[in-house]
Design a protein with these regions (language model features):
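Bacterial N-terminal signal peptides
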Residues: 8-21
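N-terminal secretory signal peptides that target proteins for export/translocation
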Residues: 1-6
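Bacterial Sec-dependent signal peptides at the C-terminal "C-region" and cleavage site
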Residues: 18-30
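A compositional/structural signature for long, glycine/proline-rich flexible linkers
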Residues: 27-480
């Protein structure tokens, strides 16, 4: 009996050894696939939110690194961290560098500041009424201003105070509280024309920065403060906007920044996806599903930002778009990232950037056409400081090169013309107005090849601009 069943038992044992493990593997495959699917989906959705949430900070970190370190032979190093760089010429297409949609009316100051160790003092000279503003941007993109509109033009010492500072500030300093440990300061000083440039340069050179300790001692350290070793980049080559370096950079930044209590639930999701402030992002330990999800998230988020930047603005006046939701974003992470995606801007109380890209028929503005803006007597833009009009190539919002090397027009310039009744016009074309047209109050903004956008800058805009009552004139097409 035992012998009869031995082959059967042997066959059963062989089946248990050979078949069941195979069945086990087959049973595990759906589970493994499900895990990968969940990992990818979760990383994709949370990663998309994370990219939008952190885009501004990572973009500013990248910009800071490029301007404070020599990253290539062709890269201009502006100044070390905690020091100012001064642009002593008005910007042109040849000198604008990476600055997006710059103006051609002011000299720029730029500085990147690390407030972890101690506050930083910015000394502003007496500008004797000359317009200036310093836009102080934290790394969430929130903006504050000091300057003519807010603090006047007399000599003053401002102090940038980070979120962790505890202590009493000395008398004689005007504090500016910054919500992140890092800040970017972009200053503007008005220039009327070439004859005014040397006086404006003296004003720009009058700005200076010191640590609070240097200010107290009255002595500047012999070596300027530079970015701490090993702070950035995290990999070589460092491509934080288009690779998983983004999440590594964001993770490192989040781990050291104070965050709002209201962001806790969102940050917990970032932790679960591997890049929040309570974890350390490690690309080598990501599951394949998580890796795929985060890479997809970056593509989706960038596509969203491209689309968001093309959305129509609700405030449209005679074809001009008035973007007023700039510089203060609260919990609108998409708006914050969209603005950073296209460039950074002043608060609307400081400057409004009204843009026009199409004529009255909805056709894009073109360099081979002639346009005109007519401002009746008494209808100058209502501003407390000045206004200017510039043209930018639609493809990249850079200045339109032109033979006359004129990149803005405005009534703060000595060559600006008005008619005897106070009215004026602006011809927007390759060719200038005739002498008779100039005498009749027609000014000229040259343009170059291809489609472009007009930007009307309004510095210290009046209440009628801010509340929607002011409308720029309709653009006339002179030659179709």
């Amino acid at each position: 009996m035992r012998a009869r069943f031995a082959p059967v038992l042997f066959a059963l044992a062989l089946w248990l050894v050979c078949v069941l493990p195979a069945s086990g593997v087959a049973a595990e495959d759906p589970r493994r696939a499900a895990t990968a699917q969940v990992d990818e989906a979760f990383a994709y959705h949370v990663g998309t939110l994370g990219y939008l949430y952190g885009f501004t900070a990572v973009d500013l970190l990248q910009q800071r690194y490029k301007e404070t370190h020599r990253v290539s032979a062709a890269q201009q190093t502006l100044a070390p961290v905690n020091r100012l760089f001064r642009f002593r010429e008005l910007l042109t297409p040849a000198t604008v560098g990476a600055l997006r949609a710059p103006n051609a009316d002011t000299l720029y100051l730029s500085g990147w500041f690390d407030l972890r160790q101690e506050p930083i003092v910015i000394r502003a000279p007496d500008t004797v009424g000359r317009y200036y503003t310093l836009a102080i941007t934290d790394f969430d993109g929130e903006v504050q201003h000091v300057g003519r509109r807010t603090t006047g033009t007399a000599k003053r010492d401002f102090v940038l105070v980070g979120p962790d500072f505890v202590g009493k500030l000395p008398a004689g300093l005007t504090p500016v509280r910054v919500a992140t440990h890092d800040a970017w300061v972009l200053g503007r000083v008005l220039v009327s024309d070439a004859a005014d440039l040397s006086a404006a340069v003296k004003v720009v050179d009058g700005f200076d920065t010191l640590t609070l300790g240097e200010w107290r001692r009255g002595v500047r350290a012999s070596m300027p403060t530079s970015e701490p070793d090993g702070s950035l980049p995290l990999s070589s080559p460092w491509t934080p906007m288009v690779s998983l370096d983004f999440f590594a950079t964001l993770n490192r930044w989040l781990r050291e920044q104070p965050r709002r209590r209201e962001d806790a639930a969102l940050l917990a999701q970032f932790d679960a996806a591997g890049f929040g402030p309570a974890v350390t992002f490690d690309e080598t330990r990501l599951s394949e599903g998580t890796r795929r999800g985060l890479l997809r998230a970056m593509e989706e988020a960038r596509a969203t930002l491209r689309a968001a930047s093309l959305r129509p603005i609700a405030d449209v006046r005679n074809g001009w778009f008035f973007p007023l939701a700039l510089g203060r974003y609260g919990y609108d992470h998409l708006m914050r990232a969209t603005v950073a995606f296209g460039g950074y801007a002043n608060l609307p109380e400081e400057t409004i950037y009204a843009a026009l890209t199409a004529d009255s028929k909805g056709e894009l503005l073109r360099g081979d056409r002639v346009y005109r803006l007519r401002f009746p007597a008494g209808a100058r833009p209502p501003v407390g400081a000045f206004w200017s009009l510039s043209a930018y190539r639609l493809a990249d919002f850079s200045f339109m090169p032109n033979a006359a090397a004129i990149y803005s027009v405005g009534d703060h310039k000595p060559e600006f013309r008005t008619a005897p009744d106070g009215s004026f016009a602006i011809r927007i074309a390759r060719e200038p107005p005739t002498s008779a047209e100039r005498e009749a109050g027609e000014n000229w903004l040259p343009v170059g090849e291809g489609p472009y956008s007009l930007v009307l800058r309004l510095y210290e805009p009046g209440g009628a601009v801010l509340d929607g009552r002011y409308k720029p004139p309709v653009l006339e097409t002179v030659t179709p």
